[in-house]
Swiss-Prot record:
Keyword Metal-binding in record: yes
Cofactor binding, per record: Binds 1 divalent metal cation per subunit.
Family note: Belongs to the IspF family.
Pathway info: Isoprenoid biosynthesis; isopentenyl diphosphate biosynthesis via DXP pathway; isopentenyl diphosphate from 1-deoxy-D-xylulose 5-phosphate: step 4/6
Source species of the chain: Chlamydia felis (strain Fe/C-56)
Binding site for 4-CDP-2-C-methyl-D-erythritol 2-phosphate: D23, S24, H25, T149, S150, G151, E152
Signal sequence bounds: none
InterPro entries according to UniProt: MECDP_synthase, MECDP_synthase_CS, MECDP_synthase_sf
Protein name, entry field: 2-C-methyl-D-erythritol 2,4-cyclodiphosphate synthase
A GO term for molecular function: 2-C-methyl-D-erythritol 2,4-cyclodiphosphate synthase activity
Length: 176
């Protein structure tokens, strides 16, 4: 039985889809000049990440969450092509490409982010990170949740070797 086709209930006008994404990167050496960028925000007192791109794990996790909804692989496909053919390392451009992969009848309605890392200190910049995410996704600030934990030394991230991010993203799809 096809539940959607055979249901006596009317077809809903909106379908909610949930995407999940993850990314992590190891820090470069302390002497690296590459900036540490998270959610498009620069953290001055930490080295950048080992990555072809700027290493923005927050924007990368969001890209992966969108990819889990659209089935279009951005990181490892589109982003690699942008890097190798045009030298583009800006993760906000990768995120723009992920957003473009949404159908015209799909809207991002909410995003939740959690970050784990012993460094940098996230709390002073959480507000700026929320604003940057809201702006990049063209959603209200109230639709962006973000938490961070130090990891208490329990993993490589908690020991300060890198940073990890998970993202849960809700997409509303109009079916009327």
């Amino acid at each position: 039985m096809n539940a959607e086709k055979d249901s006596p209930l009317p077809k809903p006008q909106w379908v909610y889809r949930v995407g999940i994404g993850q990314d992590s990167h190891r820090f470069l050496s302390e002497s690296s000049a590459k900036p540490c960028i998270l959610a498009g925000v620069i953290f001055e007192n930490s080295p950048g990440f080992q990555a072809n791109s700027d290493g923005d794990i927050v924007f990368h996790a969001i890209c992966n969450a969108i990819s889990s909804v659209t089935h279009r692989i951005i990181l490892g496909d589109v982003a690699d092509e942008l890097f190798h053919t045009r030298g583009i390392t800006d993760s906000s451009i990768y995120l723009s490409e992920a957003i473009k992969s949404l159908k015209p009848n799909q809207l991002i309605s909410h995003v939740a982010i959690t970050i784990e890392g012993n460094r940098p200190k996230f709390l002073p910049k959480l507000s700026a990170m929320r604003q940057s995410i809201a702006s990049a996704l063209n959603i209200s600030l109230g639709s962006v949740g973000i938490t961070a934990t130090s990891g208490e030394g329990l993993s490589d991230f908690g020991c300060g070797d890198g940073v990890q991010c998970f993202c849960v993203l809700t997409v509303m799809e109009y079916c009327g």
